[in-house]
Amino acid sequence: MMMSKIVDYYDLGQFVEVLKKLGGSVVLVGGCFDILHIGHVRFLKKAREQGDILVVALESDETTKKLKGEGRPINTQDVRAEILSSLEMVDYVLKLAPNLLDNDYLELTRKIAPKVLAVSEEKEASSFLSASQPKND
């Protein structure tokens, strides 16, 4: 089953089935990637080296605005997805829905079941990454 490199959040179930059929280890990265720069490219290359399939969970325009502030995003989610999908190291871009809750991010991570959750030291790590990490209560 062939699937576009750009996947909508609402097609997550079908996407997970495709990943299972492909086999191999999945590396999951999350972020805004609003103004793609060399730091992003190096990070994505390094993340891709950790497994067989690199999936970028791309934040919505609404979430990017909340994380980055007024005037952001510069590029819409569709444009950011197209740019990311053109990079050879990126296998899939999963366009996240707006207003996801911590539990949505956790469920997404459980369903995709990555071998590696690649985290940047940058502040852009986003709610996706912080929600995916265990909380100490």
Where do the protein language model's features map onto the residues?
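Nucleotidyltransferase catalytic core that binds NTPs
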Residues: M1-D137
